[in-house]
Amino acid sequence: MQSLIKGINQRVFMNNGINYKLGEVCEIRSGYSGNQLLSKKGLKVSRIETISGHKVNLERVGYVAPFESSENYKLQVGDILFSNINSVEYIGNTAFIDKDYDLYHGMNLLRLTPNNMVVIPFYLYLLLNTNRMLNRFKTVCNKAVSQASINQTELGKTVVQIPDINAQKQICELYQALYDKLESEKYANSLFQKQKQYLLRQMFI
């Protein structure tokens, strides 16, 4: 299944479309930079490690005290978190906000809010994860000794090719079907492994 996704990945995004700068199809914002709490109390905020697995992991968030403009930082369904400060290998890591996580946008990640009139948020998320885009991020990032970074302005200049909405919908539906099948296979494999371990334990009782 993964090889199938990789194969489709290289083809479906080569369709004709209109060239935009990324900053023209989404709002790009930096996160809240207030001090984080040592205790797990207050508002949950995203951190680099929150999206290290390419999806939101609520076990790896930070916490901050409530602040006046907090609602401006609350992540909404359709937002995309983008890792712009990381090692070169992980620069450009993203996570799609697919539901309300009651999570706020923290520092060291950029928040991309797509313009729904131009691009379907999930389509933009998929596009940012193509090899072509990931290789570009690795090429244009500023490389230091221990980490790399892409500033907000440079990211906004990234050229993306956006087809019409109907084409975007078809691609999103295809990928969603593939993702659902992958998750189903992972779950089935997990159940199989648990059953196998249980049977092995029973043999030695």
For each predicted feature, which ranges?
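Short, surface-exposed secondary-structure boundary micro-motifs
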Residues: 86, 174-176
